[in-house]
Amino acid sequence: MKDYLVKALAFDGEVRAYSVRTTNTVSEAQRRHDTWRTASAALGRSLTAGTMMGAMLKGDQKLTIKVEGNGPIGPILVDAHANGDVRGYVTNPHVDFEGTEQGKLRVYQAVGTEGFVTVIKDIGMREPFIGQSPIVSGELGEDFTYYFAVSEQTPSSVGVGVLVNGDDSVLAAGGFILQIMPGAQEETISFIEDRLQKIPPVSTLIERGLSPEELLYAVLGEDKVKVLETMDVQFNCTCSRERIESVLISLGKTELEQIREEEEETEVHCHFCNERYKFSKEDITNLIENL
């Protein structure tokens, strides 16, 4: 099954809902960064939330999420675009902890329970929108829920889950975001709160093979949900050799000549996708000649 996202309304417009399958997306991130189990879960949850938050934007708008906790995983960075493209990385991918007796990974131990979630939105204005909230649990779903309440004043529920196999490969990933719209009735809010208390963990629902639509039906009730749009989502990095060449050219002739003199081979590393671009002395000479 391919990864895709669903945008929906529920309860006659009182609730805005997003749901996504990110199994392939998170698998690609795990493959590129060689993340261990708990790191995979933390990065996967962040990518999943970022994918849905990116889908709230329009056109060529994009956002960056930084989760900076006090845990050993270090900062998590995610870039997400309105078109469903997402990329991300963890600073220390080789972090893992024993799970609970129920098999749940202790993501909070990797992320940390103190720090901040920062969201930077590039929405075409002169200055980007920057929102920030403290980490409240380190489990990430609760942290993004709190972010929406504090920074965007939008009552929300964020559920994100990643299932990881013993060999570190990703079995399933996905999640949902529910947002209460202004004027929603108390009965609607109470109904959703009650359902959220009763449903299994998101990762369990995903493991059962539920599609994004079925995930929303499980949370809200099939008769309450009206799907508006679906869109493909994927791990996609914007880096390329041509872009790296442009960055090198921007350094100027003097610095490029110094690089050519000092380095047999120049390597540029993209943190987001882990690609490495190598430039020989001859490559650097060609760049200098094109200045």
Curated annotation (Swiss-Prot):
GO MF terms held by the record: protein folding chaperone; unfolded protein binding
Pfam family, one: HSP33
Domain of life: Bacteria
Assigned keywords, A-Z: Chaperone, Cytoplasm, Disulfide bond, Redox-active center, Zinc
Record has Disulfide bond as a keyword: yes
Cysteines engaged in disulfide bonds, as pairs: 237-239, 270-273
Predominant localisation class: cytoplasm
PTM statement from Swiss-Prot or TrEMBL: Under oxidizing conditions two disulfide bonds are formed involving the reactive cysteines. Under reducing conditions zinc is bound to the reactive cysteines and the protein is inactive.
GO cellular component entries: cytoplasm
NCBIfam families tied to this protein: PRK00114.1 (NF001033)
Protein name: 33 kDa chaperonin
Organism per entry: Bacillus cereus (strain G9842)
Gene name linked to the record: hslO
